[in-house]
Design a protein with these regions (language model features):
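Bacterial N-terminal signal peptides that target proteins for export
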Residues: 1-13
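Noncatalytic, solvent-exposed loop/strand surfaces
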Residues: 21-410
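Hydrophobic helical h-region of N-terminal Sec-dependent signal peptides
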Residues: 11-23
């Protein structure tokens, strides 16, 4: 039987996709991935891990620790150049710029001046890109053209001590962000298409944690750490549904993203440990029930991943660890320090866990609840990395101090 021209074309396309690492590749449209849980789908571990990563391209984009967002064949990067914050749309295949938007940004002062660029990851949905600048400016751009849709600054020059780090979330046509600073802030929801304010919960200002979405019964909730508590507010109206005290002390901060699994919320903070609660519907309201508490391990500047009943993360002393997520008991802690001060991104890549601490070494290890088992490690950049890696198929996009690069596992 003859091979048709169509089948030849399909075969050629498949070969190109496989070569580019795009088969089973997923989008990474927001902070910590599609579901804000650090999980990668479609990643296949190589039969033999290469000795090093292959750099396909690298381009200078400006300072900042914001994780890029990947949607289709476009990479959205948010950085600072001089006195301006810049959003760029790049072609994922070669790093070439498609469009950019920029505006004058607030000066970053004090200890935070060592990291003057944005830390908040863009959120991409419904044809829009939403960014949050270091000074609290929330912007919405058209994802295709870069045209400004709306820009808001509800708390001018009011920011947390080290400026903003929370990444906005888009839910049902609404952009939601925790804005302002200590003693003066609010979780605010804006209509994505118009920028009109839909609701605000103004009881507490933000620290550095990013919100996640949780559904209990038929109620969608925005769950986040605030200055002093962990809270759940209605995604549709901003009504406070439940809260638990979780105030940091001394040099501790609420910076880790809560982890949601069904009706369970796991949250962590330096000096207070890791905790798990169950959120339940009761009458017209909601109640919480503590499931466990682990005072030993409390990551602050990274968020663990939940995999097969275990939590994998990095301690404040930069030691990789594992907690039994059913009991809260420590399963293991590796003695080797990885980088600086507990800064890291932890990724569930299916057959492996990947950790990228600020040392810029990508550590690949087994998702084993019994013991730490390192598989390999790679140098991902020459300068420190504080952004999350974006993993899609065989592709790994990394943002270092001033550049973004595409690395390949091949």
């Amino acid at each position: 039987m003859k091979t048709t021209n169509l089948s030849k074309a399909v075969t050629a396309i498949c070969v190109v996709l496989i070569g580019a690492g795009l088969i089973n590749a997923q989008d990474w449209p927001q902070w910590r991935g599609p579901n804000r849980d650090g999980k990668v789908s479609g990643f296949t571990a190589p039969a033999k891990w290469p000795k090093e990563l292959t750099q396909k391209w690298k381009t200078t984009v400006g300072s900042g620790d914001a994780t890029p967002a990947l949607v289709g064949d476009k990479l959205y990067v948010f950085t600072r150049e001089g006195s301006e914050e810049v959003t760029r749309c790049l072609k994922a295949v070669d790093g070439k710029e498609v469009w950019q938007d920029k505006y004058a940004a607030q000066a970053v002062t004090g200890a935070a001046a060592r990291h003057p660029g944005p830390r908040s990851s863009p959120a991409v949905a419904e044809g829009k890109v939403v960014t949050l600048g270091v000074g609290g400016v929330l912007s919405c751009l058209d994802a295709g053209s870069g045209k400004l849709v709306w820009r808001k600054d509800p708390f001018p020059k009011v920011v947390p001590q080290f400026f903003t780090a929370m990444s906005p979330i888009i839910v049902d046509g609404t952009a939601i962000a925790h804005l302002g600073g200590k003693g003066n802030g609010a979780i605010i929801a804006y209509e994505l298409s118009t920028g009109n304010e839909k609701w605000r919960w103004a009881d507490e200002g933000p620290e550095y944690a990013s919100p996640v979405l949780m559904t209990v019964g038929d109620t969608k909730q925005i769950v986040t750490l605030t200055e002093k508590n962990i809270v759940g507010v209605g995604a549709a109206d901003g009504k406070l549904l439940w809260q638990l005290p979780f105030a940091p002390e001394k040099r501790a901060y609420n910076a880790a993203t809560p982890i949601v699994e069904g009706q369970t919320v796991i949250y962590t903070g330096a000096g207070r440990g890791a905790r798990a609660v169950k959120v339940e519907k009761k009458g017209d309201g909601f109640v919480t029930k503590e499931l466990w508490s682990n005072p030993e391990l409390a990551p602050q500047f990274n968020t663990p991943v939940l995999k097969d009943g275990f939590l994998f993360g990095l301690t404040n002393r930069s030691n990789l660890y594992c907690i039994n997520a059913e009991t809260g008991q420590t399963a293991w802690t590796d003695a080797t320090s990885q980088g600086r001060g507990g800064f890291a991104a932890i990724v569930d890549a299916g057959p492996v866990i990947m950790a990228l601490p600020s040392s810029s070494e990508l550590i690949v290890y087994k998702p084993d609840g019994k013991a730490y088992g390192e598989i390999t490690r790679y140098k991902a950049a020459e300068s420190p990395i504080y952004a999350h890696p974006v993993i899609s198929g065989k592709r790994i996009f990394v943002k270092d101090e001033n550049s973004v690069a595409l690395l390949m596992l091949e």
